[in-house]
Structures are given as C-alpha cells and as structure tokens.
Amino acid sequence: MLTYKTFKILGREILIGVVWEEKIQGIAYSLDGLEFLKDQLSRVTSHLKSRGVKVNLLEEKSRYPDLVFDVLKGKIGNEKGFEELSLEGLTRFEIKVYSWLVKNVKRGEVITYGKVAKALKTSPIAVGGAMKRNPYPIIVPCHRVVGKNNPWLYTPKPSYKKFLLEVEGWIS
C-alpha cells in the first residue's frame, strides 16, 4: 500500500510517502512537491523489488506518514519508529548498520562514516553504501552520518540533509 501526506515544519512543506504492508517497507520525502516525491518513491520501490520485496502501490490511508513526521519532530524516538519497519529485503549488514545508528546517534547529533565504520569494524565506504541504500530515511537517520571533509555525501539533495539537521537543531 502507499500513503502520502503533506506537513509543515520550519515554515516549509514536507511531503512524506510511505510504502507499507503489515509494516513500513519504504519511506520517501520531498521538499520540492509531489513530482519529486513520486520520483523518490519510484526509486525506493524499484530498490525493494530488486531485493525480492513484493510491493503494492494501491493508495490507502494509514498512520505511517504521521509516525514518520512524529520521528522528524522528535515527538517519538527513532528506536520506536524502527519497531514499525519491515526490514524486508535488507542484508544482515544493512540491518546491523541501521540498528546501530538508530540506537547510538541521537537527535541533534552527527557522526562521521569513519566513526560508524570503526564502531562496526567495517569500512567507511561500506557504511556509506548502506546509507545510500537506506529505504527508511528519517526513521533510520542517515542524515546524521556525515563525511569527515564533506558532510553532504550520499544524499540525493544536500539541501534535504541540511534541512533535516536543521529541524533536529544541529544546524541553526
């Protein structure tokens, strides 16, 4: 199923789209209107399908966009949101990275790819790849992972990463 909804925060509109069945299969968001959201949802669903996840894009109401927005606002924590994710189609490594990130990097904090890699005994490039493939942005806060020399790596739009960090109070 697919549900999307428009919200306002910091004087801007954010559209949040969620693909779901029993639990959340994928999330996309847009600060640039419905067409960009549809492009992002297409990217997420293609990725899920390539991993063998059955996706139904029939539009139906659900509470999931509100849940994602509540995580963004800090009304509920990322760990609570993480419980609502299906984790279908993820590798063991991706689950390990996403779980660690949700538990260890809190709202308003950032961490480098290198530090995540060190904590998980892997390479920064492997961590970056997992962040790039993250089908659950906002709940799995890949925006909190930054490059040592370039904080805006692995994001479709650097302005989006900046916006999420601004909402969380890291950038003022």
UniProtKB/Swiss-Prot annotation:
Keywords: Cytoplasm, DNA damage, DNA repair, Methyltransferase, Transferase. Gene3D superfamilies: Methylated DNA-protein cysteine methyltransferase domain, Winged helix-like DNA-binding domain superfamily/Winged helix DNA-binding domain. Disulfide bonds: none annotated. It catalyses: a 6-O-methyl-2'-deoxyguanosine in DNA + L-cysteinyl-[protein] = S-methyl-L-cysteinyl-[protein] + a 2'-deoxyguanosine in DNA; a 4-O-methyl-thymidine in DNA + L-cysteinyl-[protein] = a thymidine in DNA + S-methyl-L-cysteinyl-[protein]. One of its GO terms (molecular function) is methylated-DNA-[protein]-cysteine S-methyltransferase activity. GO terms for biological process: DNA repair; methylation. GO terms for cellular component: cytoplasm. PANTHER family: METHYLATED-DNA--PROTEIN-CYSTEINE METHYLTRANSFERASE (PTHR46460:SF1). This is Methylated-DNA--protein-cysteine methyltransferase. The lineage of its organism: Archaea, Methanobacteriati, Methanobacteriota, Thermococci, Thermococcales. The gene is ogt.
